[in-house]
Structures are given as C-alpha cells and as structure tokens.
Amino acid sequence: MPLLVDRPMHSFATVGGATCLTSATNLNTPSGGGCILLVDCSANDGGVIDSLSIIANEATTTASNVIVFLSTATTTSTISTANTVAVAIGGIGSTNMGERTNIALPPLSVPVPNLGGDTTVSETDKKNTGLYVPSGALVYVGVDVVLTAPSATTVAHVFAQGGFF
C-alpha cells in the first residue's frame, strides 16, 4: 500500500557554522549548538522524507559530513544522546560551486510496483527509500567539521522533499 500524504514537504536548512557533534569520531554525541532544524513533525501526524540533498555553495568547500538526526527534542538546547540519534550521513567534498550530493536513505516498507516476483533483484531493491518521521519527532542536520574554506562564512544547504501525513 502506498504512503498517502496530505501535503507536500519541501524544507531547507543552512549548515556549516558550528559542528553538530561533541566528538568528531562518535555519531552518538549530538551537540544542540550545531544542529539546525530541518523538518518539524512535533505537532502533526508525521511525514516521510523521500529525498535529502546537500548543495555546496562555494567552490573548494571544506570536506565535511552532513549528519541527519531524528529527535524528540523540541528545541536545540534539549538535544541529548537520550533523545536524538543519527539516521543518515552524506559528504561534502566539493570542488564545484553548486555541486549536489544526495544522501542515501534506508528502505521503507513501501514496495516498488512490478518487482514483487522478480528474483533477480534484492529485497532492498524491491522497496522505495526514504525516512519516516513519526508524529512528535523532529529532524535536525549539522556538519561534523566546521566549514572554514574558502572563507569563514562558508555554508552549505540541506534540502528535504517528501510529504506530511
């Protein structure tokens, strides 16, 4: 059965000024100071993100990862390891202005039509990908390394597309 959405979702966040982790080598250390709200489902029936993209705004942007967090924290000041988990990650390694990087998302329980009986494709290939955001949850994004090149004001944009239930 397909996921039915009430209205489309198109949201963006600007990242790069602060790191979203307290430890650069541990995804289980979210820092509210570097997390930026991307999607808010705290007061609706939830949603699904079917596409996440990173846009590098400047040539030779600092190499960094954009980390996507699913959280029940309604403000960045209340983000902690108890209420926030990393669910996706994508890299910024731009040498070209405007370069887009799509963040890989996990398979959903939504089948792709006409692939059910095909034994030549994997079980994962038979499902659409996306990120289900339950009612009461929020999606935050941030970078693991502050974007300092080519300038101290360098930022990247993260776009989410999908729908709200």
PLM region spans:
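Surface-exposed, low-hydrophobicity beta-strand/loop segments enriched in small/polar/acidic residues
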Residues: 1-165
